[in-house]
Amino acid sequence: MLDLKNLQNNFDEVAKKLKNKKVDENILKKLAELFASLKKEKIALEEFQAFQNKFSKELATAEDKESLKAKLSENKSKINEQSAKVNALENELEEIAHAIPNIPDECVPVGEDENENVELKKVLNPPSFDFTPKEHFELGESLNWLDFMRGVKISQSRFCVLKNEGALLSRALVNYMIDFNRSRGFEFVNVPFLVNGATMFGTGQLPKFKEDMYKVDDEDLYLISTSEIPVTNLYSGEILASETLPIKMTCYSACFRKEAGSAGRDTRGIIRQHQFEKVELVSITKPEQSDSVFNEMLECASDLLSSLGLAHRHLMLCTGDLGFSAAKTVDLEVWLPGQNKYREISSVSNCRDFQARRAKIRYKNEQGKNELVHTLNGSSLAVGRTLVAIMENYQDKEGKIHIPDVLKKYF
């Protein structure tokens, strides 16, 4: 959640940045009106309280005590009424603020959508083939690695069954990713895939993205859309010791998304599924540590792709494509020869204190004061899309898939 004091004190500046992040101008106008109303009603409340304080002290020596008592009683009623007005405005303001995204960093390019993201660099060269490379779903079906028909039969569309070497390769990737991330100093944690509403709120999924979540009927439980949610919230409501930071974690999980708004996109294959697997990086840092840890996380995910021999590129997301909780995001896109283009395989984001304010994660700074931490997250990597990338990049003209050397010991 945004710092409401900063929003109120620097409204025009912050509102401009939020417009770049596609926040509706009517919402910003409503916020401005609420801030003005709240200021007015608080002044009135303070005047009533000042009256009460002043004349309560004079009651003992007043000549007409009964008259003053009546005035104080009447004023007390006004204080209660005015307090209710202030509380109602504060609640309305906070409710709207819950759906306002994070402010983009100054380094984030202003842009409307993904077409205005900025390429930072390319890593490795895409492979060349003396034949037309196939897409992963063709290879997967011919090798009996991917069973779409039975996935749909037992579930619905956008579900798939992995079989034989395809399932083994997926498992090998998970183990390799965890080991790689641990070698870079990230502690492995294993968390529940079902979390409560407060946890979903803490990282920004609720209330704005409720319609994209799978919820358990009659229970305050949701299936996670990313392990960023439970891992970040491991420290919700806590005050951490300064010397424990940064905390760097990696986690494997299944992820569940309704993919609302994705109709017609990636309808074939396993690029976009309702259930998929991911190995995540999550860090909790002091404010002054978050930029360097962001670079560590980005380097970790990029080096992981390089270790698998997968060509990829770094993209700085523009304001219009930036996620709800992120102040800055760099996407990694892997080369898929079957599609003849780069596709997203990782997003590394610095959320600054946005999630920490919602989840109430603080640390005791050097001055002994409680201060909000910064939170960061990133995929290292999306397992299904890495499987897709290996299938397409390591295929031969006979339709066989060769396994990267670093994965062979995991079979």
Curated annotation (Swiss-Prot):
Disulfide bonds: none
GO biological process, one term: selenocysteine biosynthetic process
Name listed for the protein in its UniProt record: Serine--tRNA ligase
Function field: Catalyzes the attachment of serine to tRNA(Ser). Is also able to aminoacylate tRNA(Sec) with serine, to form the misacylated tRNA L-seryl-tRNA(Sec), which will be further converted into selenocysteinyl-tRNA(Sec).
Originating organism: Campylobacter jejuni subsp. jejuni serotype O:2 (strain ATCC 700819 / NCTC 11168)
Entry annotated with the keyword Protein biosynthesis: yes
Primary gene name: serS
PROSITE patterns from the UniProt entry: AA_TRNA_LIGASE_II (PS50862)
Family: Belongs to the class-II aminoacyl-tRNA synthetase family. Type-1 seryl-tRNA synthetase subfamily.
Primary location class: cytoplasm
